[in-house]
């Protein structure tokens, strides 16, 4: 049924489907009272999400490694919507030091935080270690976002408490989370080049995004905090993430042309989960084409989620 919906664009229970765009799913939503951080908001899905949230009135903070690209994105959005509120801050998610620096920069703005969209990522990279000695896909896609989210939680909690507005965290996962290592997360061999598979390492990092969402969702519910966190699969979209994918991906794309989305369609699920009023109180879910769907067995394994949480905490605490 999911494949049928992807091919035909038929709407699901939410009223939206694979053919829906980010503008479609946010139609008539007024976001002027909201502040959102979007990581990687300089191209592809992230840029489209920044544009649409800015169009709907949200104060958007583009967090990006390349400050020139971020400012170019800001100028593009302002040319389209002169009254949009867009700020840019430097953030390299592969660097723990950069994440901590970003937090100081953001808190200095003295603004609330209602929405965090963990969008940035790398894909199918040849093996390399980050400056902190962590395999690059795991470092950028999971550890950087894990630390960023944890360090922003107090601000999100106070914003939700003072405004009465539900905070929302959106983790960009992927259907690729189903293609990972045999054990799901290869805890003992994350940084082992001999066991490295660029595609399985990507799948592992996307599984980690889902496990992070589910673990944090449970913790926030236990605290009674007015913040939700959900994961999304944006669909198959040609973005610069595919720069390391090579001939095999080109062949796959040619064979499955009817499944691929354009960027406005690819950003729809992100914007739907971030803004739509129908999702008030919905947390710990996995969305595809703006509808709740079922992830892999690994993704709903609470023991694995807790193990990853503890592993991630110990890892970031061990770094300056």
Curated annotation (Swiss-Prot):
What's its job?
Involved in protein precursor import into chloroplasts.
GO cellular component: a single term: chloroplast inner membrane
Task: Summarize the subunit comment.
Answer: Part of the Tic complex.
The active site of this protein is located at: 196
* One annotated GO molecular function: oxidoreductase activity
Organism this protein belongs to: Brassica napus
Identify the gene encoding this protein: TIC32B
Print the keywords alphabetically: Calmodulin-binding, Chloroplast, Membrane, NADP, Oxidoreductase, Plastid, Plastid inner membrane, Protein transport, Transport
- For whether the record's keyword set contains Plastid, the answer is yes
- Transmembrane intervals: none
User: Which residues are substrate-binding?
Assistant: 174
Picking any one GO biological process from the record gives: protein transport
Is the Chloroplast keyword given for this protein? Answer: yes
Pfam hit, one: adh_short
Similarity comment: family membership: Belongs to the short-chain dehydrogenases/reductases (SDR) family.
List the PANTHER family hit by this protein, alphabetically.
Answer: SHORT-CHAIN DEHYDROGENASE TIC 32, CHLOROPLASTIC-LIKE
Q: Where does NADP(+) bind?
A: 40-46, 92-93, 119, 140
Which top EC class applies here? Answer: oxidoreductase
Q: What is its EC number?
A: 1.1.1.-
Where are the stretches annotated Interaction with calmodulin? 301-317
Where is it located? Plastid, Chloroplast inner membrane
Quote the protein name from its UniProt record: Short-chain dehydrogenase TIC 32 B, chloroplastic
């Amino acid at each position: 049924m999911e494949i049928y919906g992807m091919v035909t664009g038929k709407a699901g229970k939410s009223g939206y489907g694979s053919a829906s765009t980010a503008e479609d799913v946010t139609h008539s939503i007024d976001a002027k009272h909201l502040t959102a951080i979007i990581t990687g908001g300089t191209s592809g899905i992230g840029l489209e999400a920044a544009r649409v949230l800015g169009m709907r009135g949200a104060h958007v903070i583009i967090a990006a490694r390349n400050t020139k690209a971020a400012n170019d994105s800001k100028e593009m959005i302002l040319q389209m919507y002169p009254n949009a509120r867009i700020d840019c801050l430097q953030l390299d998610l592969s660097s723990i030091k950069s994440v901590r620096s970003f937090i100081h920069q953001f808190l200095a703005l003295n603004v609330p935080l209602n929405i965090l969209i963990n969008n940035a990522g790398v894909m199918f990279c040849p093996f390399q270690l980050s400056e902190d000695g962590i395999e690059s896909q795991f470092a950028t896609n999971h550890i950087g976002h894990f630390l960023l989210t944890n360090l922003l939680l107090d601000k999100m909690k106070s914003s939700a408490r003072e405004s009465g507005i539900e905070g929302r965290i959106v983790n960009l996962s992927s259907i690729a989370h189903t293609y990972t290592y045999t054990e799901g997360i290869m805890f003992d061999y994350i940084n082992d080049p001999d066991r490295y598979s660029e595609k399985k390492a990507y799948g592992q990092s996307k599984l980690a995004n889902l496990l992070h969402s589910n673990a944090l969702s449970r913790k926030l519910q236990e605290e009674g905090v007015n913040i939700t966190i959900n994961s999304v699969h944006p669909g198959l979209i040609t973005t610069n993430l595919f720069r390391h994918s090579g001939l095999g991906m080109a062949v796959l794309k040619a064979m499955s042309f009817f499944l691929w989305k354009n960027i406005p369609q690819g950003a729809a699920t992100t914007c739907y989960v971030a803004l739509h009023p129908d999702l008030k109180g919905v947390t710990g879910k996995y969305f595809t084409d703006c509808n709740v769907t079922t992830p892999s067995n690994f993704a709903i394994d609470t023991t694995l989620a807790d193990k990853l949480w503890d592993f991630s905490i110990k890892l970031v605490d061990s770094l300056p």
